[in-house]
Amino acid sequence: MHATTVKNKITQRDNYKEIMSVIVVVLLLTLTLIAIFSAIDQLSISEMGRIARDLTHFIINSLQDWK
C-alpha cells in the first residue's frame, strides 16, 4: 500500500513538472511573438526585408561553419 502511495505521489509530481514546463514554453512563445509583431509594427516593410535578408545570410553562414 505504501509503495503505491509513493508511486502515485511521484507520478503527480512528474505530471506537475510537465504541465509547468508546457506553461513556461507557451508563455515564452507568446512573449516572443508579441516582441516580433511589435518590431514589425514599428519598422517599415523595406527595413523588414533588409533585416530578413541579413538574418537569412547569417543563418546560412552559421550552418555552413557548423559542419
UniProtKB/Swiss-Prot annotation:
Record's subunit section: Interacts with PhoQ.
Record's subcellular location: Cell inner membrane
Keyword Transmembrane helix: yes
Pfam family, one: SafA
Protein's name according to its UniProt entry: Two-component-system connector protein SafA
Source species of the chain: Shigella flexneri
Primary localisation category: membrane
Phylogenetic lineage: Bacteria, Pseudomonadati, Pseudomonadota, Gammaproteobacteria, Enterobacterales
Highest taxon of the lineage: Bacteria
